[in-house]
Structure formats: C-alpha cells, structure tokens
Amino acid sequence: SDGIIRLARAAKKYGKVWVVAPDGQRSAMSHRITLHETIEFFPVDFPVEGVHAYASTGTPADCVRFGILNIVKEKPDYVFSGINYGYNSGTDIQYSATVGSALEAACAGVHAIAFSEGASECHEVTDAYLEQMLKELMEQPLAHNQIWNVNFPQCELEKLRGILYDRKIADCGFFIDEYLEEGLE
C-alpha cells in the first residue's frame, strides 16, 4: 500500500528496514493471530531501494510475530505499523489491525508505533511531519508494553492546529492481579 511505502521510505533514514505485511487488505482484524491454519510468508519486490520485504497470507499481528521471531536476524529496536488509511482513535482502536500489530510487537518486547491518517487523498500533514514524528517518538522512552498511536489529520498543512501525544498499553492480559484487602473480612 501507499502508506507502507511512505513509512518505509521515512524509516530508512534511521536504520535497516524490513517490511512484513499481509498480501491484501486486513482491516478490522484487531489483534487476531492465526492458530489452526497454515500461513505462508514469501519475499516480494518492494519499491523502496534497500528495503527487504515479505508478504503473508496471515494477519498483521501474524506478520509482526513471524517477522520478529523468524525473518529479522536480530530483535528490532522498533516496529512501525501503518500508515493506515483512516483514523485509529476512540473505540476504533479495539478493532484496528494497525494498532493490534503494534500491540503484538509490544507483547514481544519491542517498542512500536502505529501510524494512521485521515481517509482522504490529502496527506500534507503526514508527509510534512512523518520523519519528525519518527525521530521524536523513538527518542522518548516507552514503558514496557506501551505503544505510540499516531493519527495524522486529513487537512491542509496550514490548517494544522498542533500535535497531541498519546500512548496505549498492551499488558498482554485482561486483568491485573492487584487486590485491595479492604472488605475481604
């Protein structure tokens, strides 16, 4: 997709880039992984020079997991997911394969950033700020199991009103074993 190409091109400035992505559209897959089916991964030509790329019949989370464990020779410093076509905010986050794959990276102990932009042909803000956001967010420490979730607005550059920073937590579980002893008597 155009978003993956633009993200890979920007990320190349900061190190080696490997792309492991589904072979087709996988919107609203959330954090789904494949358990009882065979998944194929195969090398593909990629339009950004120096980027190693693989496509997969699996989900975005499958791609992150397999990429970290089997394709990339050393554990990556970061996983970048996106650029998704459409915002991932509010309740949409729970359905997002873009955010889900970043959460999969966090569960594997790798810092991750999910990138999305408005569903329009206007990419002025993304194109102007993508490299800066990559640099700034990679320099800011993330706690274990946190990810950055970046949504670029679909407006012209002169209408941009500012940048809001947001972190999400992937605790790789559904609850925290922490109890209050009050009222247990």
Predicted regions, residues:
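Electrostatically charged, flexible surface regions
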Residues: D127-E185
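Short, Asp-centered acidic motifs that coordinate Mg2+ and/or phosphate
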Residues: Y78
